[in-house]
Amino acid sequence: MKNNNRFFQKNIKVLSLILLSVFLSGFSISKQDKSFQNDLEDNQAKPVEISSRVSPETGSDIKDEAQQMPVYGNWETFTVKDGLPADKAYCVRIDGDRVLVGTSAGLAVYENETWKTYTAEDGLAHNGVLSIDVSELTGDVWLGTLGGLTRWSAGRFETFTQFNSGLANDVIYTVICDGKDVWVATGGGAGSYDTYTREWGIYTERNAPMHEPWTYGVCAGGGKIFIAAWGGGVIEYTKETKQFRDYVDPDGEMEIDLFPDDGVIHDITTGVTFADDILWVATYFGLSRYDGTRWKGYLDHDSGLVSNFINFLKADGPVVWLCTDLGLSSFNGETWVTYRKNENNKKGKIIITEGENTKEISSTTSISHEFVIGVDTQDDVVWIATSKGVSRGEILKDLTAGL
Amino acid sequence: MKNQDQKIKLRVLVLTILTMFFLFPVSDLNGQDKKLNYGNTTDELVPYGRFQKAYKNFFDDVQPFTGAGREKVPPTDLTEVRIGFLGPLEGSILTPLGIQMLQGASFAIEEANNKGGYNGIPFKLMPHNDVGLWGAAANEVVKMNDEKVWAFLGSIDDINTHVALRVALKLEIPMVNSGDPDPTLTETRIPWMIRNIADDRQSSYALVNHIYREKKHSRIAVLRANNRYGRVGIMEFRDAALRYGFPLVLEIRYNDGEIDFATQIERMIKSSPDAVVLWGNAKETALIINQMRQMGMEQPVYGSDRLMSKELLEIAGENAEGLVTTCQYNPTLDEPNLVAFNKNYNERYGMEPDVFAAHAYDGMNLIIEAIHKAGLNRALIRDLLTDHKTFQGYQGITGELILDPSWNDIGSIWMTEVRDGKFDFFPTPPLISDEQENKKSTP
Amino acid sequence: MKRNKKIFLVFGGLAIISLFFIQFHKWSVHHVNYITAVDDHPLNCMSCHLYIQKDGIAAKLINEDYLSPYNLSLAPDGKKLYVIAQDANALLIVDTKTNKVIDKIEVGEKPHSVVIKNDGETAFVSNQWADNLYEIDLTSLKVIDTLKTGSGPAEIIFSPDEKFLYVVDSYSSEVSIFNLQTKTEIKRLMAGNNPVAAVFSPDGSQAIVTSRRTLPIPYGTPPMTELTVIDAASQRVKERKIFENAYLMENAAFTPSGDLAISTLIRPKNLIPSVQVERGWMMTHGIGIIESGNEGRMIQLLTDEPNSYYSDPFDIVISPDGQKAFISHSGVDIITVIDLNEIRALLAESTQEKLDYYSNHLGISARYVIKRIPTGANPKGLVLSPDGKYLYVAERLEDKIAVINTETLETINSIDLNGPSRITVARQGRRLFNNSGHTFQNQYGCYTCHPDSHEDGLVYNMAGADMGRNLANTQTLRDIGDIPPYKWNGKNSSIYKQDGMRFSTILTRTESFNYDDLDALVAYIVTGIKNPPNLRYNPTGELTAAQKRGKKVFYRTHTNCGKEIPVENQCATCHPPPYFTNMQMADVGTLSDTDDPMLFDAPQLNNIYESAPYLHDGSAATLEELWTKFNDDDEHGVANDMLKDQLNDLVEYLKSIRDAKYYKDDVEEYKADINQEN
């Protein structure tokens, strides 16, 4: 007892401090729990912690397919100051010697190192151009806008709306050309337009396995059309049989992913792309990959994906490009390369992740903004559309070049 | 020495008592928070919670908006500050609700303008009907963008609200939803919308707790509207009932506009339920209740939030007695702001405000206040609405706003029971956990 | 007694006959006056009851099967002339030495054009109403292959290396490109509206395609017609040249040096009140020119003269020396010869502003028109001999080929294609239809606004004295004999009335047709104008899934909510088969502020897909717009409950509706349904 007393006597201050700190920590925990995290400060592009948290890839086939991953740099940026009609660019499409950019204030065309803008006054359905594709057959440019679908053919604008045509809805998130057919993902269902027969198709919950008619992305490949249905996962349409099937999140819950790699990560899908027999699916909850047999999921905590919030994606051969709210990621099944902007010194960051190893390299040039909305590649060049300007990067033949 | 020991003992005792005094509430708080899963979900109601921990919980954190826009300089030549409104204004069975919603929003605008608008510039409401032909909601939001609104309020119908939200994201327009209780609306990670009305998840939990744990029913038949409100609304109820160990004995549907429900009621009778849950709009539900009683079904009836309506009482009359529903607020509370709103609204529009008017009023006030604080910049208005600080705990006429990480309102929800031809409101009782339930049932 | 009885019977009989005759005469006068809307018609029963017989023995007896030469090609050595006999579905081969028809090859329905390969051994013929090409071996004179095209294949051209074939799909407004090695269609390029002709530039770098109809334009604006330029290397459209205030660009030609590309065209003043006709200049006719220099400057020049118009320019050919152009004016039976050096000089000395002024100048043609050569009825296709010495002219309604010496500019020969020698009443009517002789100063013929007896897609200010009042969308004349009344407001109870007094008062502003001519014109309109097969949307009669769903929507009696649709607001009430018109007047809520009050004659829906724009004033650009823009109050059928995919289905069904002859069963079914309901 005496010892005890002595102990108390000696350590009374320490004990008091401990007790006080316990109290304070309890209080602070309770306060934090009640008010949640303040993201206002986080809004300013908080850097993602890159560490060795990445779990090893499990799918051996992915490794087998992986090829050498190119690294891009020498970023050149274009904004209103350079001739863009608006800084906010929704999409970009390389078309031979020119580059087409869909902005919030019209279509911008970069040719011979100058920008030219086309707006609703010229015949665009709406100045908000969300998606662009070019028909390989005819060279016609198809523009998905906030106010309808426009075909731009050798200078002539032809507009299809839900009022003058069979278009499902005027808000067109994605347009693609598939041979003579044009497919759209709209706010009122997916749609198809046969440029030969002029027949429109509308695909909604009334005739396809969707819960609701909201669609966000569409792509073609392997004799199929894949539709990113908002809340309905991925809808697959086989052209030959004209049959639909769907791929949904097996756990059926919006708030969780129960098991990794059990199917598409989430039913709210934002984009689809198909290349090399692989279907890639973007969500605001991560990335999914489907090889026709197995699904594999990628999240920011278990892979080199920089953010789960994926605005758009596009596969080019073995490489898939991911436009996220924290930069541009690219992935070939084995290696991740992410391009970010260093807010402190305006330089760029290249983050390379392979298995559990992550390396960050500083680059002298940077993408124009980390909120990336669109991407397109051709040969050794990549173009991206961002929340503030568009950027053009090129393959760094010598990785040290430009770094 | 003895004195010293006593002194020490006393000090320790005081300190211990003080510590215990402070620690108890903290531990109590922590204890409660430990139970709080996403959406106020108790442990036993967590999806797959009894069997498997989820690989990823998507709404543990907040989705930031990292895009550009905060740097945009506000215009200096404005003559009005436009705020959009999207609701069912004509051509829909929801039109009466949409009109109330519009009036609630307009009322807030009028009050704000009476106080000088935004730095002397009046606010202007830009109403848009979401029920136009051939899928209007998406186009209407585009029109709002062309009209240069700074934010908008909308809507009630699930489908239209979802569509509007998608466009709001693309156009980056802050959106406040005050009328669509679809739980999936805020489960999209779109950082451009907050909701200031409790959702069907909260309604479902309240009903499930009341029906199974308090009233001890075990065989529930559901008759719901064959629309998204009915389909999505019942989902959380169905799942929660299942997780409590009581799968629904029957779930059947009816179409909007139907007037004869004999077939469905016969099926319900055959399923021998000991209570019935109705999820749909007031008119059809009232007719169903009448026909149920007519066909000899005397089981207690529980229902969704839209049943708390004058129309239901008028059509169902005495048959509505005992009907228990949820409601996202209590319009009969003796809160000065609420009382004043009810009175002024009645004077202004010649009718009592309903749940949509009241939440629209609160929602519009959130937008107005956000504009006042953030200025005329959409991204900054968004930042404010979603920062979990500025409006966390906001006291509106509909109660306290508590936003979860997905910006869903998980504040309190009320329940009502029809007694003597009126809706009697009572607070939702705390959810009874498995442990408490087991204790109760063990002698 | 017996005699008296006989007398009584005879006189009684005579009295009854007289009475009957008087009554019959009275009825006949009333009937004829009602039908013709005049009171001095000679009461020739045959006018209506014989000449307008469409089938049966009488029809066979009074009508003939004509050839109607339309387009021509010459063998590379010039020894054989290949003639498209449009009405005989045949390719005629003429020996240019003897000027005799030496062979006839059966081709597909309504052939349009023929091209011959450089080796002279193979020909391709486009069958406009069969949507295909025939490949013909000219040695064996056999059809050796059939290539499926887009809709309404018209002109065909080879790429310079003859590896590819470009086909102008006139109905679907495209150009199909075929790989001749694989005989496959590799792509279709969007062309202008209703393109018909194409020609490669002399250097082979590009092809130009002319079109007849204006592009879809904002309501109430003048026509804008596209000339499409296709880059031969990429086989993509590289430019779309828009000729403003012009249309009906039927054909085009390059000068041998390529310095000029010239197309025929018409400049309509459709938005000017039609009273302008009696002041002239309502329709002017001429050429559109594109210079290879001057950044591709575009010019329009008239071939008309003050107080004399040369209507409906059709084909154009240019002499091998590049000095002269020859234009067939099918509305006035004239070949105009143009001095291209004068044109070059005019272009060289004129600013764009000056040239714009010339585009409306009736006197400028005196500078470059060097000769007007008369031809037989309705000259169409032209071809020059390889040495340029002879011009062959297809005289379509003469069944002959005129041969003109290009040095003397005189007709030196006429090749008889051995068609029927007799000119039937209907044939005479067709000549009248295609000729401008009855219009004040020959400004236009029926054909001008009704090319192919169909419609030109323009909206006219009919008879109104004020700008923009009473605008009327041109209506088709195909198969209209059995569906009176006529005009949008249904004021004309018969074609006699439509094309009689009213015609001269409002449209031609000259003396009206005499009764023989009127009989002939009516006979042609009633018997000679058929709907093309609807190969595009309903080739076999088997409806697509969407069309079947749309048919249900068309015949529905209840809304999506289960509410009964009032009979007068159901589609099939006003649009019952076989013509899909009940021939009654109705108010569908589409009267505009600029219209005088009127009800609308329910229009027929056969082949409705090729009649854009829609509504009486052409305000609906597409079928969809009928319901998305002009039916707010469900007056034009209850449609506002429909989902978009249902509307699409309905439109697909409407586009599938073809000629009335296919809907006899539907009539019975429809009547049975109605009876059942009643």
What are these model-predicted stretches?
Chain C
Residues I62-D65, K104-G108, T146-G150, R188-A191, ...:
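Surface loop/turn motifs at the tips and blade-to-blade linkers of beta-strand repeat domains
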Residues P76-D77, N118-G120, P160-D161, P202-D203, ...:
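Residue-level detector of Asp-centered blade-edge/turn motifs that repeat once per structural unit
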Residues N4-K5, L19-A75, A88, T284, ...:
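Short sequence/structural segments immediately N-terminal
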Residues D95-N99, D137-L141, N179-K183, D231-Q235, ...:
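Short loop/turn segments that connect beta-strands within beta-propeller blades
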Residues P42, A88, A130, S172-E174, ...:
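A detector of repeated loop/turn-to-beta-strand junctions in beta-rich toroidal repeat architectures
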Residues Y66, N71, V209, T214, ...:
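Periplasmic c-type cytochrome electron-transfer domains
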